[in-house]
Amino acid sequence: MERTFVYLKPNAVRRGLVGEIIKRFEQRGIKIVALKLFWMTREQAERLYEMHKGKNFYNELIEFVTGGPVVAMVVEAPRVIEMVRHIIGNTDPLKAGTGTIRGEFALTVTKNLIHASDSKENFEREYKIFFSENEIVDYYLDVQDDI
């Protein structure tokens, strides 16, 4: 089983899309093993997006993601990194496919509703910014028999 880190940005929370987004993951057999609602600190945001420091959109991105509550989660399924990236769509909503979360609901590249780790290495780095190991809950998901 593979895990990945996902968080819903403040505009997803403020627009009432949390349930819709989680539903799309669960309908695909993706298991949530950690979940929390909180305000991201500037320090957390800077650690998460450290690779973008110095880019023209960096400050706007940090201000945006710390400007409202977010929902962070760790999810699990076979090939979950690839599956989640497919479900959420391209970073640019105009390039995101029809039926993807960003394709249907996102407005701009910065305000694209959701972030998901793009590799196992980034998952390992990113989830540790927000979760401790004892916050990951292992349990049996009935749909696992079908995967």
From Swiss-Prot:
Keywords: ATP-binding, Cytoplasm, Kinase, Magnesium, Metal-binding, Nucleotide metabolism, Nucleotide-binding, Phosphoprotein, Transferase. It is an enzyme of class 2 (transferase). GO terms for biological process: CTP biosynthetic process; GTP biosynthetic process; UTP biosynthetic process. Pfam families: NDK. InterPro entries: NDK-like_dom (IPR034907), NDK-like_dom_sf (IPR036850), Nucleoside_diP_kinase (IPR001564), Nucleoside_diP_kinase_AS (IPR023005). GO terms for cellular component: cytoplasm. SUPFAM superfamilies: Nucleoside diphosphate kinase, NDK. It catalyses: a 2'-deoxyribonucleoside 5'-diphosphate + ATP = a 2'-deoxyribonucleoside 5'-triphosphate + ADP; a ribonucleoside 5'-diphosphate + ATP = a ribonucleoside 5'-triphosphate + ADP. Its EC number is 2.7.4.6. It is found in: Cytoplasm. The active site is at H115. SMART domains: NDK. ATP binds at K9, F57, R85, T91, R102, N112. One of its GO terms (molecular function) is nucleoside diphosphate kinase activity. Gene3D superfamilies: Nucleoside diphosphate kinase-like domain. It comes from the Bacteria. Its cofactor is Mg(2+). PANTHER family: NUCLEOSIDE DIPHOSPHATE KINASE. Belongs to the NDK family. Homotetramer. Major role in the synthesis of nucleoside triphosphates other than ATP. The ATP gamma phosphate is transferred to the NDP beta phosphate via a ping-pong mechanism, using a phosphorylated active-site intermediate. This is Nucleoside diphosphate kinase. It comes from Thermosipho melanesiensis (strain DSM 12029 / CIP 104789 / BI429). The gene is ndk.
